[in-house]
């Protein structure tokens, strides 16, 4: 009797989940994984399949003569763009699609289908029909605040989002483009025109459009700090380009023209233009008073469109200015795409969507990974934000999503963001609601290539640690807490409300589970989970140390005149606790450097590593201060207040 090897749709750990899966009865012999293709098979799809299947030890694809391939691709014009049918049975896979993108997405589903049965891999016999709910599924990566991907990691990022059916990649650039005419604002390891061109071509191979995002209004301090451009600043060496200063338009004209030359004819070009709060407060005061703030803003967008429209790209802009004054929509080109960015666990995002819809503009929803300023993303917040916003975007039939990853403080890691990023990818592709529980069940197999639910549990455990550390009134702050002086009275008072033991136990559980983990796929992302857990553990231990040192020093003070042995013991332990803190920072520094170098260029790394060394140095100096206090006590049998020892006393 033939046995049923088809796996019910509920058991297929695929991200995204296909729209329709029909099980097909087949024998064990018919469950052989198809691994041969004709010479014309999509090379990007082949690269993705080979990368995944080699890592899983399934093996690479082989090229055979036409008519002999076990994976075949057929054209079916009745299917919609990006849609596909995939039939797997009898050791063969048949792909049907109306376009190359659909065929590629079918191959990406095939890549995730194999399941391990005992010691061998098998593929379920299924018929799948699938198509995206939203046309555009774009990842926006901040590459301007410190982390700046190496070319190898840019390519890995693009390959990975393509494997999970995203079709747009948008690097957010403020000053990082190395302009041939205006190189001074850029970091020495910035993105050159040749690199931008190469990334565009590479992305296109994987059916991903590279969408430049060049800030053109606010957030331009790293350009305006250069004296050559300082006269274009709204406020001295500030953040906002004054739109009525010729230097502003001349500079933007040059770099945008050069970026367009590098990327060719992108479908969109994002001009950002968000958070312009200082417009009219400086040298444009009279200009804005005369013309009106919204009119000045709209004129800037019109000017940017004039630069970009000849390329065929539609301009994109953030929506915050329009939400403040919807009348702006009457003044800007109707071809513009408005990117609707709103973060946090809001009850609904429909009012923001409705505002843009009433203006008659196409829009994309831009949820966030909630990773900024955090040791690890605020996963709970990100999932609520993405789930609600994307579901409402699908109901409103928006053009797509523009999933954002930000690095405001320059310390956060791209590799920490895959869980919320890929949830957004799944939610934008699937027509149905994507439950966090189902995504958690599917993620380890789809992303890490392992049948181990512990990976998703650990992601959520790290989110739980963050919740313990951040009360509702304090958020986006775990990086700051990591560097905060635990002996600061204000910080200590806030942290007194935190169950530090619970934080450490939860973090250490993740550390222990990830200590030896090397999944076949994306092993570095697992290492970054370990690093985050260890940093959380060190953060909580730092505040424990401060509390314990205060108690030990108070005990020393109370015994200073009548119990020399107890006093010296307390002082010695205070010193040891500072050494422990020193060692924690110095141990973490190379781990952080390893994680950084996996993904980013070295430019900003020294600045971040210096914080580890400075924190360690402070601990060394405090250890030495306790030793000096000990020596003084041996001569005088008196001790100064703790704040004096810690160099915190008023002069």
Give the positions of each predicted feature:
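Hydrophobic h-region of N-terminal signal peptides that target proteins for export
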Residues: 2-11
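Solvent-exposed loop/turn segments at secondary-structure junctions
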Residues: 100-102, 144-146, 175-178, 216-219, ...
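N-terminal small/glycine-rich loop or linker at the start of catalytic domains
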Residues: 126-144, 364-373
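Catalytic cores of large soluble enzymes that bind and process phosphate-bearing ligands
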Residues: 37, 41, 45, 98, ...
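A structural preference for short, hydrophobic beta-strand core positions in alpha/beta folds
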Residues: 62-63, 212, 317, 365
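Substrate-binding groove of N-acetylhexosamine-processing glycoside hydrolases
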Residues: 14-30, 198-201, 207, 249-261, ...
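Substrate-binding cleft of carbohydrate-active enzyme catalytic domains
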Residues: 135-319, 329-331, 337, 393
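Contiguous, structured surface segment used for ligand recognition
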Residues: 10-136, 388, 411
């Amino acid at each position: 009797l033939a046995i049923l090897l088809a796996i019910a749709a509920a058991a297929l750990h695929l991200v995204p989940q296909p729209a329709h899966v029909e099980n097909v009865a087949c024998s064990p012999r018919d469950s052989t994984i198809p691994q041969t293709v004709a010479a014309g098979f999509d090379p990007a799809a082949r690269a993705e399949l080979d990368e995944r299947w080699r890592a899983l030890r399934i093996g690479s694809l082989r090229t055979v003569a036409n008519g002999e391939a076990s994976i075949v691709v057929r054209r079916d014009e009745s299917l919609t763009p990006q849609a596909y049918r995939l039939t797997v049975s009898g050791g063969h896979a048949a792909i049907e699609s109306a376009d190359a993108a659909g065929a590629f997405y079918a191959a990406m589903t095939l890549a995730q289908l194999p399941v391990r049965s005992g010691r061998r891999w098998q593929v379920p016999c299924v018929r799948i029909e699938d198509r995206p709910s939203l046309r555009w599924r774009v990842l926006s990566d901040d590459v301007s605040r410190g982390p700046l991907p190496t070319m190898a990691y840019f390519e890995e990022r693009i390959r990975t989002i393509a494997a999970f059916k995203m079709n747009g990649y948008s690097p957010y650039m403020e000053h990082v483009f190395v302009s041939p005419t205006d190189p001074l604002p850029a970091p020495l390891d910035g993105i050159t025109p040749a690199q931008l061109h190469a990334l565009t071509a590479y992305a296109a191979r994987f059916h991903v459009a590279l969408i430049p995002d060049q800030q053109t209004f606010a957030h331009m301090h790293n350009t305006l700090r250069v004296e050559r451009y300082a006269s274009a600043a709204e406020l001295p060496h500030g953040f906002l380009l004054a739109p009525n200063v010729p230097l502003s338009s001349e500079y933007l004209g040059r770099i945008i023209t050069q970026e367009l030359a590098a990327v060719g004819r992108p479908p969109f070009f994002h001009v950002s233009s968000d958070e312009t709060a200082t417009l009219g407060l400086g040298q444009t005061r009279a200009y804005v008073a005369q013309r009106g703030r919204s009119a000045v803003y709209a004129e800037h967008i019109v000017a940017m469109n004039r630069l970009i429209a000849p390329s065929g790209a539609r301009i994109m802009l953030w929506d915050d200015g329009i939400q403040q004054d919807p009348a702006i929509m009457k003044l800007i080109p109707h071809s513009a795409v408005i990117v609707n960015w709103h973060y946090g666990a809001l009850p609904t995002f429909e009012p923001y969507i409705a505002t843009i819809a009433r203006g008659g503009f196409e829009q994309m929803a831009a949820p966030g990974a909630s990773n900024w300023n955090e040791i690890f993303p605020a996963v709970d917040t990100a999932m609520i934000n993405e789930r609600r916003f994307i579901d409402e975007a699908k109901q409103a039939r928006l053009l797509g999503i523009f999933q954002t990853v930000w690095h405001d403080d320059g310390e956060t890691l791209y590799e920490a963001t895959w869980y919320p990023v890929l949830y957004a990818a799944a939610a934008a592709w699937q027509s149905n609601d994507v439950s966090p529980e189902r995504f958690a069940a599917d993620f380890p197999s789809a992303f890490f290539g392992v049948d181990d639910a512990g990976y998703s549990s650990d992601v959520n455990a790290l989110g739980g640690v963050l919740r313990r550390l951040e009360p509702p009134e304090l958020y986006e702050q775990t990086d700051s807490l990591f560097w905060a002086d635990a002996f600061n009275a204000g910080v200590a008072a806030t942290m007194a409300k935190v169950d530090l033991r619970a934080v450490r136990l939860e973090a250490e559980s993740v550390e222990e589970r990830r200590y030896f983990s090397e999944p076949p796929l994306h092993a570095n992302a697992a290492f970054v989970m370990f690093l985050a857990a260890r940093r959380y553990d060190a953060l909580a231990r730092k505040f424990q140390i401060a509390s314990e040192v205060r108690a030990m020093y108070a005990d020393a003070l109370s015994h200073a005149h009548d119990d020399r042995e107890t006093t010296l013991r307390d002082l010695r332990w205070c010193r040891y606790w500072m050494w422990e803190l020193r060692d924690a920072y110095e141990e973490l520094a190379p781990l952080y450097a390893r994680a950084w170098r996996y993904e980013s260029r070295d430019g900003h790394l020294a600045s971040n590593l210096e914080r580890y060394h400075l924190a360690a140095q402070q601990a060394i100096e405090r250890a030495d201060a306790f030793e000096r206090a000990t020596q003084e006590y041996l001569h005088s049998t008196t001790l100064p207040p703790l704040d004096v020892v810690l160099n915190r006393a008023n002069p």
